[in-house]
Curated annotation (Swiss-Prot):
Gene Ontology BP term (one): mRNA catabolic process
Name of the molecule in the record: Polyribonucleotide nucleotidyltransferase
Domain of life (superkingdom): Bacteria
Organism of this sequence: Shewanella sp. (strain ANA-3)
Sequence similarity: Belongs to the polyribonucleotide nucleotidyltransferase family.
Record-listed Mg(2+) binding positions: D485, D491
Cofactor names: Mg(2+)
Its EC number(s): 2.7.7.8
Stated role: Involved in mRNA degradation. Catalyzes the phosphorolysis of single-stranded polyribonucleotides processively in the 3'- to 5'-direction.
Start and end residues of each S1 motif domain: 621-689
Primary localization class, coarse: cytoplasm
Record gene name: pnp
Assembly and oligomerization: Component of the RNA degradosome, which is a multiprotein complex involved in RNA processing and mRNA degradation.
CC terms in the record's Gene Ontology section: cytosol
Amino acid sequence: MNPIVKSFEYGQHTVTLETGVIARQADAAVLASMGDTTVLVTVVGKKEAEAGRDFFPLTVNYQEKTYAAGKIPGGFFKREGRPSEDETLIARLIDRPIRPLFPNGFTNEVQVIITVVSVDPQIEPDIISMIGTSAALAISGIPFSGPLGAARVGYINGEYVLNPTVTQLESSQLNLVVAGTESAVLMVESEAQALPEEVMLGSVVYGHDQQQVVIKAIAEFKAEAGKPAWNWTAPVANEALVAQVKELAEDGLAQAYQIQVKQDRYAQVAVVKAAAKEALLAANPDVDLREVDGLLGSLEKKVVRGRIIRGEPRIDGREPDMVRALSVLAGVLPRTHGSALFTRGETQALVTCTLGTERDAQKIDSIMGERTNRFMLHYNFPPYSVGETGMVGSPKRREIGHGKLAWRGINAVMPTAEEFPYSVRVVSEITESNGSSSMASVCGTSLALMDAGVPIKTSVAGIAMGLVKEGDNFVVLSDILGDEDHLGDMDFKVAGTRDGVTALQMDIKIEGITKEIMEIALQQAYGARVHILNVMDQAIGSHRDDISDHAPRITTIKINPEKIRDVIGKGGAVIRALTEETGTTIELEDDGTVKIASSNGDATREAIRRIEEITSEVEVGRIYNGKVIRIVDFGAFVNILPGKDGLVHISQISDERVANVSDHLELNQEVTVKVMEVDRQGRVRLSIKEAQTKEAAAE
């Protein structure tokens, strides 16, 4: 074994790339390290493409092994299972920038597997996974227009920070990941604390500049360790067939794309394509219909893009900077804690908000440690939203990714646990879709949270921008349709408030996207965002003054931390009885904070009364109503507070001489007693006759 190693400094860390020792039967394998965080990246590609395949089957699998953090998995089987949400999101983060770097027409199956084998709790594994993937693809010989660089950018005390640690991110106003080639930014994913557009743009430029050291190092690594390039050539276009398809379908497609209603347009496009195929089959029964489908798709793209570049109206008749018609409704469902229906053109989201207690929060145990997520946002994309049939079940990668993007857009305005002691779950059901459903989810979530009475700092809206670029000519599009996303060169999603950006996601399919284009897109997005916020604020401009009658109300009280064990009781018996008998949910914290949750005010008050009884101290000289719980020869034990008993000596039962305690008292008898003394050991001395004397004096 002859290892080839490349090391370089990158921000605060040393990055090492190594190949030639592990997984030598893969087309490429790289052990990539950043500090103590290490990933094994393998790449395997099939040498032959499946006949007739018209798509590129790229699979990216990212897996975190618990042994990397010195842990044993939980659960019955004690081994890793299905991918977690974090693993799915990082797999998408790696997939998005590498996919456009494979050549058009390349349909060989390629699988990339990233395995986290060691983790430093201060260095997240996503950036080194992207770097390792870029290096493995670069040396594999598979056609790939890399290398690719990746960087995380923070913003702390007004300065950009390259690859901040986990601790630094806690005080950062920005968490941005940018990936790109030497000359172009390809992907951006970020979460921010309502930062100005110029700060966001600056962070993208900064991250791209800093990652040049990665790109250079991988190029040097490839020169030393690279395998011979595959003998692959792009399929040659059948120019005669291209001309025939153009003649048969171009005019029909141009007319079909004048139809503004999506379903009607799709129906007419299908008619035009079917007629073209029928004519081609009549002329040549051996024509390859898959090839024809590809050519029709390319022609469709050319027709739509040409109209936009020429300054003609968009597919639905809008100008480039126009937002589709908006409909905003809050409080649309009677029993949910909060709800909203947000409609933008043919995209619609029904969003609900549910409030719960702290124990309803999501508990995540990952290789980076345990954490609790009080705010959850789930995005569902059922097939009926686009007029199709399909499988319904667990969320797909796309749904998880869109939900996380919407979560990032909203998280910056969420209240702290001290301000609002509830767990919050939002669900966005996409009921119609024609582009930008994730940004519709952001808008709907903001509305539903306000309807639920969640004190978010301000309204948040999201908008998806697009781009069509031909040579030096380009047009930036606001509020793109699904077709414009599919046929365009950029998908640029921005969520934010009136004051700044809270989330930015960008996927670019071509090179040549300049800082000027990104700046125009951000400014155009700001105008669209403010327009949407104005409409949203007309429906509900601030959060409701109170939460729903159907939501649990959380009341917080403080007790002496030393009394927590009394509230819990032996084996949890006391708190279990409290919750069952009052119908409340009770949560205790180590500092003595007690949170009582119930939708019934009387139940809450009863729980508070009983907790105060349990935790109150016995006061010398005070009169208590108690119950006889045990009789002995020398007196009786009386319970005066939950868990607090005292002794009434035989001499303190009556002013008369008492020969036999049982002649005066019986078990479970209610008596009035006065506390005479509490000794150093906490023993309580009670008196019935002193209590009677005090009561008589009071009368």
